[in-house]
């Protein structure tokens, strides 16, 4: 830029005309640093919210681009529900080993089944539990275009009791749902993929997970839809585990595909650790693990380039 004072435009104290001045200089525009996250969740009060669900509730509805929520380290003892009107939510954890969403939840129908009265106490079917009525899993995703990274999703009924009944940590029910570097932990029915004809892309709704850890013992990855799991550890928390229970509808394109994964875990009877009352104590069944079994008549499950660390 040039700043110029013409000759004679200014006078000195004696009335003599000023000879003029020309200044040449550059204007430097400082780049605005883009905001990395839209909001921050921190249990210690150092962010915008102290719990995750409040941050989700505040997200504008029907977005068409990602809304980034940073989740600081901490154990968040809450239920998470991402409704259908909240697409494009991205939950970015600080450290998957230290950023944990964990609650105790079961699907017990009464006080006489697996887990007895205690399982019924934590059941989403129990009318006394209004805070968790119809919350079938600790985390439930109904929206499209959801993404999570560096977070552990845990149902502590499964991880602490190591018995049934169903105790889902994750429930996903729409299209374009993805996870990276996350952990999913329970015992029975850890993660259910439940897409329906009403889901976007219908029965062919798509899920993707990479570099994750999925843990359980009974049907711990089950449901339907098209799901690609890559570079992930499937960890059996007892011997004789069953990993998948597929329930695909006729017309499903690909079903469940596990690529470059590792099947690992416990492969022996350990009553000292699990107790003879748990499902783990079944010596007559031997030590083999089961990659999957059909839940209904049209299961599609494929394992590609997958390492098995014990017999099946």
Where are these regions (language model features)?
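Sequence-level preference for short, compositionally simple segments enriched
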Residues: 30-312
């Amino acid at each position: 830029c040039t700043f110029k004072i013409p000759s004679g435009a200014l006078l000195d104290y004696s009335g003599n005309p000023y000879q003029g001045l020309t200044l040449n200089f550059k204007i430097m525009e400082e780049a605005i640093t883009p905001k990395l996250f839209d909001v921050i969740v921190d249990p210690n009060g150092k962010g915008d919210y102290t719990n995750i669900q409040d941050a989700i509730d505040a997200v504008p509805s029907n977005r068409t681009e990602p809304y980034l929520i940073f989740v600081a380290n901490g154990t968040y003892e809450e239920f998470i529900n991402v409704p259908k009107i909240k697409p494009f939510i991205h939950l970015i954890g600080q450290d998957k080993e230290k950023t944990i969403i964990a609650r105790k939840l079961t699907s017990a129908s009464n006080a006489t089944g697996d887990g007895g009265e205690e399982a019924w106490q934590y059941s989403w079917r129990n009318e006394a539990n209004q805070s968790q009525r119809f919350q079938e899993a600790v985390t439930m995703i109904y929206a499209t275009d959801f993404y999570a990274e560096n977070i552990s999703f845990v149902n502590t009924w499964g991880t602490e009791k190591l018995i049934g009944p169903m105790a889902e940590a994750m429930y996903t029910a729409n299209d374009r749902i993805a996870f990276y570097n996350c952990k999913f932990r329970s015992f029975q029915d850890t993660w259910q993929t439940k897409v329906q004809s009403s889901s976007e892309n219908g029965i062919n709704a798509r899920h993707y997970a990479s570099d994750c850890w999925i843990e359980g013992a009974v049907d711990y990855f089950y449901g339907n839809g098209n799901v690609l799991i890559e570079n992930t550890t499937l960890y059996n928390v007892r011997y004789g585990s069953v990993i998948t229970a597929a329930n695909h509808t006729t017309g499903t394109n690909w079903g469940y595909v596990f690529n470059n994964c590792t099947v690992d875990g416990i492969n022996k009877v350990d009553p000292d650790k699990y107790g003879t009352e748990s499902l783990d104590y079944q010596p007559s069944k031997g030590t083999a693990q089961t990659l999957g079994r059909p839940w209904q008549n049209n299961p599609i499950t494929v394992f590609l380039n997958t390492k098995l660390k014990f017999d099946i």
